[in-house]
């Protein structure tokens, strides 16, 4: 499947109930529905995958390469700050990606300020809430020449 893959890491399945003061009240399903509608307007296939397991995210990145996915939008959650393996999978497959964070990681605990992915990403969006996903999709559509 050519198109865009949206990957979400650990605990993002809890959006809507997890620390709403930080992450808001939108569920992951709410976010995916908006992205699906936006991609449909642009005629761009889009797929979604969430896992709490690092290895499952890595396998999905490998599959994205085999499927010739045009772009990945990834919110790696806490794996942002810990996963060399996730970084290596993105480097090995060379699928371009945009890193997204709902909260402003730079305004939080010091350990959240380092990302193993930011320096190899096409772009990084953080601190704009769930709207960050929509902005990432707009950017991905422009980068793949399928703007809304």
UniProtKB/Swiss-Prot annotation:
Catalytic activity: 3-dehydroquinate = 3-dehydroshikimate + H2O
Protein name: 3-dehydroquinate dehydratase
Gene3D superfamilies xref list: Dehydroquinase, class II
Described purpose of this protein according to its UniProt entry: Catalyzes a trans-dehydration via an enolate intermediate.
Residues annotated to bind substrate: 75, 81, 88, 102-103, 112
Pathway: Metabolic intermediate biosynthesis; chorismate biosynthesis; chorismate from D-erythrose 4-phosphate and phosphoenolpyruvate: step 3/7
EC number(s) on file: 4.2.1.10
InterPro entries given in the database record: DHquinase_II (IPR001874), DHquinase_II_CS (IPR018509), DHquinase_II_sf (IPR036441)
The keyword Lyase is assigned to this record: yes
GO MF annotation terms: 3-dehydroquinate dehydratase activity
CDD domains noted in UniProt: DHQase_II
Family as reported in the entry's similarity comment: Belongs to the type-II 3-dehydroquinase family.
Subunit (UniProt): Homododecamer.
SUPFAM superfamilies noted in UniProt: Type II 3-dehydroquinate dehydratase (SSF52304)
């Amino acid at each position: 499947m050519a198109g865009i893959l949206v990957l979400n890491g650990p605990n993002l399945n809890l959006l809507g109930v997890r620390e709403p003061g930080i992450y808001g009240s939108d569920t992951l399903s709410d976010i995916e529905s908006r992205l699906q509608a936006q991609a449909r307007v642009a005629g761009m296939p889009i797929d979604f995958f969430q896992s709490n397991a690092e290895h499952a995210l890595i396998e999905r990145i490998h599959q994205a390469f085999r499927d010739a996915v045009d772009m990945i939008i990834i919110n790696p959650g806490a794996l942002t700050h810990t996963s060399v393996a996730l970084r290596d999978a993105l480097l090995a497959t060379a699928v371009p990606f945009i890193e997204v964070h709902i909260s402003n990681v730079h305004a939080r605990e010091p350990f959240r300020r380092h990302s193993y992915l930011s320096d190899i990403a096409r772009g990084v969006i953080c601190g704009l809430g769930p709207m960050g996903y929509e902005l990432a999709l707009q950017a991905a559509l422009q980068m793949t020449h399928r703007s809304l």
